[in-house]
From Swiss-Prot:
Record domain Carrier: where: 1-76
Species for this entry: Natranaerobius thermophilus (strain ATCC BAA-1301 / DSM 18059 / JW/NM-WN-LF)
Designated name of the protein: Acyl carrier protein
Modified residues (O-(pantetheine 4'-phosphoryl)serine): S36
Source species taxonomy: Bacteria, Bacillati, Bacillota, Clostridia, Natranaerobiales
Pathway assignment: Lipid metabolism; fatty acid biosynthesis
Keyword Lipid metabolism: yes
SUPFAM superfamilies: ACP-like
Transmembrane segments: none
Amino acid sequence: MATFDKVKDIVVDQLGVDEDQVTMEANFTEDLEADSLDIVELIMAMEEEFDMEISDEEAEKMSTVGDVVNYIEQNQ
């Protein structure tokens, strides 16, 4: 499964949004209505799924689904 598909599944599961809302350009807070706790939980789920650690500093830079996908692909 491609990185985007895995990330999309996690976002749909964690935020309860429709799959078609989750695009590379979708902003977590503006488009997907995630709050700060949702984002922390998303990052934790990504770390578990991809067996990696994402620093708080890096997590703060991630505002879109594409940001997360690109970070994972560059750091796996």
